[in-house]
């Protein structure tokens, strides 16, 4: 579970940011936004 949350914590943790790429962060935020959007529209 920590691996999935690392990109979310990356902007707030330099250690996590060093292990993850901007692309990974973008993908995770896109997925979170998509799921959140679907939940809000129902």
UniProtKB/Swiss-Prot annotation:
GO biological process, one term: killing of cells of another organism
GO cellular component: host outer membrane; membrane; viral envelope; virion membrane
S-S bonds: none
UniProt keyword list: Cytolysis, Host cell lysis by virus, Membrane, Transmembrane, Transmembrane helix, Viral envelope protein, Viral release from host cell, Virion
Parts of the chain that traverse the membrane: 20-40
Localisation per UniProt entry: Virion membrane
Major localization listed first in the record, in broad terms: virion
Bilayer topology annotation: Single-pass membrane protein
Function: Involved in cell lysis.
Full protein name: Envelope protein P10
Gene label: P10
């Amino acid at each position: 579970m920590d691996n999935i949350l690392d990109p979310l914590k990356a902007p707030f943790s330099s250690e996590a940011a060093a292990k993850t790429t901007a692309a990974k962060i973008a993908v995770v935020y896109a997925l979170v936004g998509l799921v959140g959007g679907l939940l809000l529209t129902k």
